[in-house]
Amino acid sequence: MIKILLFAGLAEQAGTQAIEIDMEQATTDEIKASLKEQYGLESIDTAMIAVNESYVKENTSVSSGDTVAIIPPVSGG
Amino acid sequence: MEERYSRQIRFKQIGEEGQKRLADSHVLIVGAGALGTAGAEGLSRAGVGTITIIDRDYVEWSNLQRQQLYTESDAKLRMPKAMAAKEHLSAINSEIHIEAYVTEGTAETLEPLIEKADVVIDATDNFETRMLINDLAQKTKTPWVYGACVSSQGMFMTVIPGETPCLSCLFEQIPVGGATCDTAGIIPPAVHIVSAYQQAEALKLLTGQKEAIQRGFVTFDVWNNSHMKINVNHVRREECPSCGANAVYPYLQDWNTPKAAVLCGRDTVQVRSESLKRIPKQELIKRLKTIGKVEANAFLLHIFYEDFRIVIFNDGRALVHGTNDVKEANSVLARVIGL
């Protein structure tokens, strides 16, 4: 089980803050693509990704037990 | 001075010595909206000796719900935010020096201000200006605190040139199309949490306690009760164009700055922006629908916002009808698109 945490507008669009994916292994790109398709999250491409609370930039492999946080930067001030 | 700051001096991490350092310090606050007024008030009360504040807008009624320095009279008089802020801050603390600039934050206007500052507080409402601050901060080796908020969420990160990753290390391109306060709304607690962190970080830096700063990117949602600190220590890149060994400060380069032009006789400003091109159109339409009716065809989309009519072309151009003022047009686009 891979746990996905959605923040800001992404959580609102998806209608949930946490999603569990029943997979042993996946890459962060695969996860993004599947969320984009399933929930129509067009803006997911500009979001920051953190795996187990550590920032990842490149496409990264994650396994069951990992938590992937997807955080769109906000601009208001 | 003793009595006024006694409770802060009693806080042992600041003490007499720290208080003296604050009095000799200079903070630049870029933006006098919600984060700007909260940060400016806190740091003025704390006794930071010089505070410079720059903002391009004037006070409107919709600001009063969260932009804590402003009054109904400021909104009635449409006072420029920087001037209104200066007036209120001077009434709060007459012992400090406040400088106010009513102008747009550009490479030209910000560079001389950042050069004089010990710490910069980011209180802008758009990423174009943040990336400018990021480059100028690296160029002048000035620490700054990124902060942003929308709806019930916020985030912040302290950037110390030469030590921590910078905003360009995290975002290779300007993040575009994010929610803005005008599209997703905002509640004051989200503002105050971000600002409280920014002020704390500023106090640590100004009193020479870099070791105490928050190393990481913090994000929270005060309505949904989440808080996460993301480790970014490994993200600093040698090849980063803003802070790497061969930094070129990409956002200070002419090709990267949004081009605005007044269209003569049309009461219209045209803004051309590379990042506007990259926002997925469907996403933009969805977002703008929360403000008003969006009409779109294959080439452009069209929306009414306040007294303005905005047309956004697929090629990265936006026309803001209803103004001849570049500053105002940029401000409208910042509020509507976060550009």
UniProtKB/Swiss-Prot annotation, chain A:
Name of the encoding gene: moaD
Highest taxon, organism lineage: Bacteria
PTM annotation (Glycyl adenylate): residues: G77
Biological processes annotated in GO: Mo-molybdopterin cofactor biosynthetic process
MF terms (GO), sorted A to Z: nucleotide binding
One Pfam family, short name: ThiS
Function: Involved in sulfur transfer in the conversion of molybdopterin precursor Z to molybdopterin.
Post-translational modification note: C-terminal thiocarboxylation occurs in 2 steps, it is first acyl-adenylated (-COAMP) by MoeB, then thiocarboxylated (-COSH) by IscS.
Subunit and partners: Heterotetramer of 2 MoaD subunits and 2 MoaE subunits. Forms a stable heterotetrameric complex of 2 MoaD and 2 MoeB during adenylation of MoaD by MoeB. During catalysis MoaD shuttles between the two heterotetrameric complexes.
Family of this protein: Belongs to the MoaD family.
GO terms under cellular component: molybdopterin adenylyltransferase complex
Listed pathway(s): Cofactor biosynthesis; molybdopterin biosynthesis
Keyword Phosphoprotein among record annotations: yes
UniProt key word Ribosomal protein: no
PANTHER family linked: MOLYBDOPTERIN SYNTHASE SULFUR CARRIER SUBUNIT
UniProt modified residues of type 1-thioglycine: G77
Protein known as: Molybdopterin synthase sulfur carrier subunit
UniProtKB keywords: Molybdenum cofactor biosynthesis, Nucleotide-binding, Phosphoprotein
InterPro entries in UniProt: Beta-grasp_dom_sf, MOCS2A, Mopterin_synth/thiamin_S_b, ThiS/MoaD-like
Curated annotation (Swiss-Prot), chain B:
EC number: 2.7.7.80
Binding site for Zn(2+): C166, C169, C240, C243
Gene3D superfamilies found in the cross-reference section: NAD(P)-binding Rossmann-like Domain
Record note on cofactor: Binds 1 zinc ion per subunit.
Any one annotated GO CC term: cytoplasm
Pathway in which the depicted protein is active: Cofactor biosynthesis; molybdopterin biosynthesis
Keyword Protein biosynthesis attached: no
Family: Belongs to the HesA/MoeB/ThiF family.
Assembly information from the UniProt record: Homodimer. Forms a stable heterotetrameric complex of 2 MoeB and 2 MoaD during adenylation of MoaD.
Protein name from the UniProt record: Molybdopterin-synthase adenylyltransferase
Organism of derivation: Bacillus subtilis (strain 168)
